[in-house]
Structure formats: C-alpha cells, structure tokens
Amino acid sequence: FLDTLNKAVKAKGDDKVIYGEVWEDASNKESYGVRRRYLIGGQLDSVMNYPFKEAIINYCKYGDARGFEAGVMTILEHYPKPSADMLMNFLSTHDTERILTRLAGEDVGCHDREWQAERYLSPEQYAYGLSLLKCAMVLQFFLPGVPCIYYGDEAGLEGYKDPFNRRCYPWGKENLDMIDFTKQLAVIRKSSKAFAQGEMKLSLIHIS
C-alpha cells in the first residue's frame, strides 16, 4: 500500500510529502514479523515523532537528562537527515493525554473514563504545569524537526485521554500568556535557517 501511495503522491510533484504515524523508531520498526522500510525504502518522507515527545516529557517532568540525550540522539543517528529535518514534533495528540495534564496531573494509569472525566488540575498544579510546558515547548520548537501544536495546547487546555483531550477550544478563556509565549517561539524559530536545517550536538553538564 505505501509503495503505491508514494508513487501516486510523488507523481503530483517532488514537493508533496508523506507522513506516517509510527510510535516507535521508524528506522527499525517491526510488525507482524516483518521489518518495515518506512524511511529507507521509498515509502514515507518522515513520521510523527513520538520518541522525542516522550524524551521531552521525561526530561521536563523528571529531569532525566541522560534519557533525553539517548532518546533524541538515537532518532537523529538512525534517520536520514531529510527525514529528521521534517519530523513532526508534538507534545499532545488526539491519542494521548494533553501535555499540560501529562506534566502536572495524576498519572492516568488504568483509571477509567469516569475517573478521567472528574479530574482537573488544581490551581497550583495548573501553574506548575504551565512552567513545565514552556520548557517543553522550547525543546519542541528548537530540536530538529517541525513544531506541530495540537490545538489548544498553546491556550492552556488540559485533559486526560480521548475524549477528554478533545474538548472544544477555550474561546475567550485562553491563557494569553501561553499564546504570547508560543508566538515568541515561532518568531525565534523563523529567524534563522539553522533551526530548520542545522546540525545539532547535545552536551551533558554535571553541576556539583
């Protein structure tokens, strides 16, 4: 299917791109006993970047610097650079908890929908979550790839899993500070081609 799709899409022009929803490392993904050739076999141009998402969350929430380095560099070392430069970098999707809830809320674990429906962040949790979200968005915008925002994240929307992560956009009740912060990140991101096409090196700093 993907071979046929790629051929049809590319027939419309080389500037047409194909993204795939792959939750793991797409360079060595194996399913149904078959190793997939998503990024090296003329199928996908790039993918949704779930590994970066988890690396960012674990770093911002738990301070896991080594895990962050490993998660990011593994992808960058495994993917062709054109695919890495096009990675869809997000912090929330319709399949996962809202980033604000993930950063500052209780772990959803195996809780059912009734439990999730009744849970909202306290004012203290919400404020703490916003501070972590800003840190996460800095990484989202300036790691290799393309920053992609799940509607409402920039406005401070919270929520657990589907359907609570799909609440309506909070028109008139947006967190204006977060929206302004997001706009500033976008301006900085567009200010230099290095953020879109440059090389990246991570350095671990030990503070005693």
Which residue ranges define each predicted feature?
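Aromatic-anchored helix/helix-loop segment that forms the rim or "lid"
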Residues: 66-75, 109-134
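Acidic/polar loop patches that form or flank catalytic/metal-binding clefts of enzymes
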Residues: 19-20, 147-151, 191-199
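Aromatic/acidic polysaccharide-binding cleft in carbohydrate-active enzymes
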Residues: 90-119, 137-175
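Conserved small/polar residues in nucleotide/adenosyl-binding loops
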Residues: 205-207
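Active-site-proximal helices and loops of the catalytic beta/alpha 8
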Residues: 1-87, 139, 156-187
